[in-house]
C-alpha cells in the first residue's frame, strides 16, 4: 500500500505538466480555428462547451492515475480532437434550425398583421353597411320604430332636439299650451331612438335652451314643468326680405337628386307588377270614391276585364287573385281610360317591389327632367349622390362597379297618384271642377224653376179679388162719363190710364144695366161717384166738391 501511494504521489505530479501542455496545444489549435471562422460568437460557445470534458478528464486522471506518461499523452491527444470535431457540425446544424424559426416568426407576424387588416376592413364595411332611414321611405309606425331601434343613434337622420321640441309643442298644442307630459309622450312615440325614458335630461336641456333663445314661452308652471307655447315671429321683416328678393331675379329652386332618385326608380323600373292585395290597399287609400272596401267585386271585375283585353298579364294565380303585370305599347301603358283603370295603373306602378334601375336610364332621366346648368356637372352630382346613398344604406348596387350597373332601393317607396302622374291628376281635377260646376248650375236652374209654381199657387186664391176690382172698375168707369161738363177740364187722366183699348168691351156691358135700372137709382150714383173721385188728384177733388155742393143745393 505504501509503494502504491508513493508511486501515485510520483506519477501525479508528472502527469500535471503533460496535461497542461496538452491544454496549451489545444488552445493554440482553437485560436487558429477561430481566426479562420468568420463568426465571433463561436469562441465563447466553444470555450464554455470545451471546458467540461477537460475537467472530466482531470477528475478521471485523478481518480484513475496511470503509470505511463506517454500513454497518457497519446490518450489525451487522441481523445481531445475526437471530442472537439463533432460539436462543429452540431453548431452549424443549429444555425439553419434557428433560421427557419425566425422565418416562422416572421410568417406568423405577417399573418397576424393581415388578420388585423382584415378585421379593420370588416369594421369599416360594417360602418358602411349601417343603414339610416331616408325621409322618402314609406313605413308603417311599427316598421319605423323597429328600423329606428336597429339604426345607431349617431347615424340616425332625425332632426336636432330643439327642432323636435318645437315640433312636439305644435303637435300637442291646446288652448292652454302644450304640457310637458304630452310633449314627452309625443317624442317617445315618434323618436324612440332618443330613448327619452332613460335620458330625460335631454328634454330639460332643450326646454331651457329654447326659453333662453325666446323661441318658446312658458305659459304655466316653472322650470321643466307646466305648459309651453311656440312664439310666433313677426311678419314685417319677412315681407321686407321678400321684397328685396323680389327685386332681384328669382333663381329656380334647385332640387336635390337624393329626393329625385326614388321617383325616378318607380317610373323607370321594368317590368311593373303587383299583387291583388297591394292594388286593393292602394286604391282604397287614394281613391275613396270607388269604395273598393265595400264593393271589392268592382275591382275584381276590372282586373279580369283588363286581362281579357290584353292590357294586363296575370303572372300568378287565377281569376282576380295573384300578381298582375302592366303591358306597354312603346313607353305608354295600354291600361287607362276610366277612373278604375287609371287607379289600377297607378297602384301597380307605385306598389311594384323591388324597385331597380340601371345607371344609363338614370342618366337619361336626370338630363331630361333635371338638366341643370351644366350636364357634365349634373352627371358628377348624380355619381356622388349614388355613392352617398349607397353608404347610408338607401341604395344597393346589384351589378356592375362604380358609376355603372344596376341599383336597387333598400326601403319601400309608395308615392301617391299626384306625385306619380301630376298632369293626369291636374286634368282630372279640372274635369271634376267642370262637372261640379255643371251640377251646381243644373241644381240652380232646378231651384229657380219652382218659384213660378209658388206664385201661381199664390195667385189662384187672389183671382176673386181681381174680379171684384175689375167689377168696381167697370162700375166706376161709366160713372166717370156721366158728368158732361167735366170732360173738357179733366184731360190729364187719360194719359195716366193708357189701357183704353180694352175699355170698349167693358163699356158695352154696363150700358144695359143703366137702361134697366129705374130713375130712382140716380140718387145713389152721386154718393158712389163722390167716394171714388176722392182718389183723384187735388184739382179733381176740389172740382168734385163744388159739383157736389151744387147738386145738394
UniProtKB/Swiss-Prot annotation:
Biased region (Acidic residues) positions are 60-71, 428-449
Q: Where is this region: Disordered?
A: 30-131, 231-251, 422-553
Q: What keywords is this UniProt entry annotated with?
A: Acetylation, Chromosome, DNA-binding, Isopeptide bond, Nucleus, Phosphoprotein, Repeat, Ubl conjugation
Q: Where would you find this protein in the cell?
A: Nucleus; Chromosome
Q: Share an example GO biological-process annotation for this protein.
A: heterochromatin organization
The keyword Transmembrane appears for this protein = no
Please list the residues that carry the modification Phosphothreonine. Answer: 51, 85
Motif segment (PxVxL motif): 253-257
Ranges of biased composition (kind: Basic residues) = 236-246, 488-509, 542-553
Q: Where is the H15 domain?
A: 157-232, 253-328, 335-411
GO MF term (any one) = structural constituent of chromatin
Give me the stretches of Basic and acidic residues compositional bias.
91-127
Q: What is its main location?
A: nucleus
Q: Which SUPFAM superfamilies match?
A: Winged helix' DNA-binding domain (SSF46785)
* Chain positions found as N-acetylalanine: 2
Positions modified as N6-acetyllysine?
A: 190
Pfam annotation, one family: Linker_histone
Q: Where are residues bearing Phosphoserine located in the sequence?
A: 6, 142, 155-156, 247, 441-442, 445
Report residues of the Glycyl lysine isopeptide (Lys-Gly) (interchain with G-Cter in SUMO2) crosslink.
64, 97, 256
Q: How does it assemble?
A: Interacts (via PxVxL motif) with CBX5.
**Biological role:** Component of heterochromatin that maintains heterochromatin integrity during G1/S progression and regulates the duration of G1 phase to critically influence cell proliferative capacity. May play a role in hypoxia-induced oncogenesis.
Q: What is the protein's name according to its record?
A: Heterochromatin protein 1-binding protein 3
Organism annotation: Rattus norvegicus
Amino acid at each position: 500500500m505504501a509503494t502504491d501511494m508513493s508511486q501515485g504521489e510520483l506519477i501525479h505530479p508528472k502527469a500535471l505538466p503533460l496535461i497542461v501542455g496538452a491544454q496549451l496545444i489545444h488552445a493554440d489549435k482553437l485560436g487558429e480555428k477561430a481566426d479562420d471562422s468568420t463568426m465571433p460568437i463561436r469562441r465563447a460557445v466553444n470555450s464554455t462547451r470545451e471546458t467540461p470534458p477537460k475537467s472530466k478528464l482531470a477528475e478521471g486522471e485523478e481518480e484513475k492515475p496511470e503509470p505511463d506518461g506517454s500513454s497518457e499523452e497519446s490518450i489525451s491527444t487522441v481523445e481531445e480532437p475526437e471530442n472537439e470535431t463533432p460539436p462543429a457540425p452540431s453548431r452549424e446544424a443549429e444555425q439553419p434550425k434557428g433560421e427557419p424559426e425566425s422565418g416562422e416568426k416572421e410568417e406568423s407576424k405577417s399573418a397576424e398583421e393581415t388578420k388585423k387588416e382584415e378585421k379593420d376592413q370588416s369594421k369599416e364595411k360594417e360602418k358602411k353597411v349601417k343603414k339610416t332611414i331616408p325621409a322618402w321611405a314609406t313605413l308603417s309606425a311599427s316598421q319605423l320604430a323597429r328600423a329606428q331601434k336597429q339604426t345607431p343613434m349617431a347615424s340616425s337622420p332625425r332632426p336636432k332636439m330643439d327642432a323636435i321640441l318645437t315640433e312636439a309643442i305644435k303637435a300637442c298644442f291646446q288652448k292652454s299650451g302644450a304640457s310637458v307630459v304630452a310633449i314627452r309622450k309625443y317624442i317617445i312615440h315618434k323618436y324612440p331612438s332618443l330613448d327619452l325614458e332613460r335620458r330625460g335630461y335631454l328634454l330639460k336641456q332643450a326646454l331651457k335652451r329654447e326659453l333662453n333663445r325666446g323661441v318658446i314661452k312658458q305659459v304655466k308652471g316653472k322650470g321643466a314643468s307646466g305648459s309651453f307655447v311656440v312664439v310666433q315671429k313677426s311678419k314685417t321683416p319677412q315681407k321686407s326680405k321678400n321684397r328685396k328678393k323680389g327685386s332681384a331675379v328669382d333663381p329656380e329652386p334647385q332640387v336635390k337628386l337624393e329626393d329625385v332618385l326614388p321617383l325616378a326608380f318607380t317610373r323607370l323600373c321594368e317590368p311593373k307588377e303587383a299583387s291583388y292585395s297591394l292594388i286593393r290597399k292602394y286604391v282604397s287609400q287614394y281613391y275613396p270614391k270607388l269604395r273598393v272596401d265595400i264593393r271589392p267585386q268592382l275591382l275584381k271585375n276590372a282586373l279580369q276585364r283588363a286581362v281579357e283585353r290584353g292590357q294586363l298579364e296575370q303572372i300568378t294565380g287565377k281569376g282576380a287573385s295573384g300578381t298582375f303585370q302592366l303591358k306597354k305599347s312603346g313607353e305608354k301603358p295600354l291600361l287607362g281610360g276610366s277612373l278604375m283603370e287609371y287607379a289600377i295603373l297607378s297602384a301597380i306602378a307605385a306598389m311594384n317591389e323591388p324597385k331597380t334601375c340601371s345607371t344609363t336610364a338614370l342618366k337619361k332621366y336626370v338630363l331630361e327632367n333635371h338638366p341643370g346648368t351644366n350636364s357634365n356637372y349634373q352627371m358628377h352630382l348624380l355619381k356622388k349622390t349614388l355613392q352617398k346613398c349607397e353608404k347610408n344604406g338607401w341604395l344597393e348596387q346589384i351589378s356592375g362597379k362604380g358609376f355603372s350597373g344596376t341599383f336597387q332601393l333598400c326601403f319601400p317607396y309608395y308615392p301617391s297618384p299626384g306625385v306619380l302622374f301630376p298632369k293626369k291628376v291636374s286634368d282630372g281635377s279640372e274635369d271634376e271642377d267642370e262637372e261640379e260646376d255643371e251640377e251646381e248650375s243644373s241644381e240652380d236652374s232646378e231651384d229657380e224653376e219652382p218659384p213660378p209654381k209658388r206664385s201661381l199657387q199664390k195667385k189662384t186664391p187672389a183671382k176673386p179679388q181681381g174680379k171684384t176690382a175689375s167689377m168696381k172698375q167697370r162700375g166706376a168707369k161709366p160713372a166717370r162719363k156721366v158728368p158732361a161738363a167735366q170732360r173738357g177740364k179733366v184731360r190729364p187722366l187719360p194719359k195716366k190710364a193708357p189701357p183704353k183699348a180694352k175699355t170698349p168691351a167693358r163699356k158695352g156691358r154696363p150700358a144695359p144695366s143703366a137702361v134697366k135700372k129705374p130713375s130712382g137709382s140716380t140718387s145713389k150714383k152721386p154718393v158712389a161717384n163722390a167716394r171714388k173721385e176722392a182718389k183723384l188728384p187735388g184739382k179733381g177733388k176740389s172740382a168734385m166738391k163744388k159739383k157736389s155742393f151744387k147738386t145738394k143745393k
